Amino acid sequence: MKSTVKKSAPREFGGAKGALAIMTGFPCLMYYLWACSKFNDSQFIKPESFTIAGFQNFFRTLGHYIYVGAYPTRYAFLVFWSFCIVQAVMYLTLPGVRTQGLPLKHRNNERLPYLCNAIWSFYTTIVILAVLHVTHVFPITTFIDMFGPLMSVAIITAFVCTFVLYTGTLLFGDRLFDKPHRLSGNPIYDAFMGACLNPRLGKLLDFKMFFEVRIPWFILFFISVGAAVRQYETYGTVSPQVLFVCLGHYLYANACSKGEQLIVPTWDMAYEKFGFMLIFWNMAGVPFTYSHCTLYLFSHDPSVYNWSTQYTTGIYVLLLCCYYIFDTCNGQKNHFRNQIYGTEVHRKTFPQLPWLIIKNPTFIRCANGGTLLTSGWYRYARKIHYTADFFQSLSWALITGFQSPLPYFYPCFFFVVLVHRVSRDIKKCKAKYGADFDEYCRICPYLFIPYIF
């Protein structure tokens, strides 16, 4: 197997300086948003004055908040690491669909095997946590009650995993994880982007696949469930708004789980290396920043957000419509890709929605051997799945109202991520497909919203 250590100037995310800024800045931002939620009624905390003394007091106050409310206790380590270990055991032992990844050029076109059983892991975890809750062994409200300490543990664990994976790859290569791949030569940038493409322990425990669904989306869902249970214990009922975030996070976790085999041939799996960017975001960023809608509802009396029936119903309709487009659009794209590569697998996992699979799809057969889908949802907009995904995220914030900016962090951040991702996708598609991509844009002229943009 040939080595692919190629030293080149870092380009994405501002190179090493940008990577370092993200690696230090985002954990700080997470703590700041959490402190605003817990200690300042979900409003931004500001310095008393824009002087040296004012900023000193500002940072001293934040440090105190973190110490008293987010200290990484031994129990928090036990809870978080136990959750990860149990998920790893399920990953290796529960039944699922076996499939293969895309041919990897740096591994002589080898196609790695994958066992896709996240859907079994999801519902098994629900049953286990339900039993532990009713037997008082482990209250599911722990996920929301210990939000701060668990967030700290997730952040620490993400940094540790990044360091171990980066150094292990450089020192031991595929004897431990995987061979170094597309290195820039700058250790900060390479740790951020990743030193290897497909790190594994053994033949089936693929770290990238493991962190893709089970850690971020499962924990996010259980944070919301914990909030719902705590609200029921406090008020004797669960508000429609808290039920909404539970539904939204359930739909997303379930969608990622039931379509796990469709993740295998995606760009993330076949090209994106596994470093701090993916490790931190999946382990800490997703569950502990996308949940600010839940934190707001949890920390306020339901009377504060007792919206009109019309408003609440409208947000429910928005969520369900966007979810339908999101689910079926991604299903169409990935089923088509699997058909092309001969890895098509039909599963009956819930929910099976109409128009999930396109019969007799139309597509462009490109000069480089690739294909570009021109039917289904993509006939109307080339990135319509991003549009649906964004409006789902926006609905999670809209259900909280407009009294706090914190729930809107996720949709605002996600919008920036999507714009960056789309610009990167277009640039790479133009380079990869050339004139065929121009023809694709002619047939499918709209990017996000049909007949508008």
Swiss-Prot record:
Entry binding sites for NADP(+): 333, 337, 373, 385-386, 425, 429-433, 440
UniProt GO MF annotations: Delta24(24-1) sterol reductase activity
Gene deletion effect: Abolishes the production of ergosterol and accumulates ergosta-5,7,22,24(28)-tetraenol. Leads to susceptibility to cycloheximide and to staurosporine, but does not affect tolerance to nystatin and to amphotericin B. Leads to cold-sensitivity, a supersensitivity to divalent cations and several unrelated drugs including staurosporine, caffeine, chloramphenicol, sorbitol, and SDS. Does not lead to a sensitivity to nystatin, amphotericin B, thiabendazole or hydroxyurea.
Pfam families attached to this UniProt entry: ERG4_ERG24 (PF01222)
Annotated pathway: Steroid metabolism; ergosterol biosynthesis
Keywords: Endoplasmic reticulum, Lipid biosynthesis, Lipid metabolism, Membrane, NADP, Oxidoreductase, Steroid biosynthesis, Steroid metabolism, Sterol biosynthesis, Sterol metabolism, Transmembrane, Transmembrane helix
Subcellular location: Endoplasmic reticulum membrane
Record's bilayer topology term: Multi-pass membrane protein
EC number: 1.3.1.71
Coiled-coil ranges per UniProt: none
Family, as annotated: Belongs to the ERG4/ERG24 family.
Name listed for the protein in its UniProt record: Delta(24(24(1)))-sterol reductase
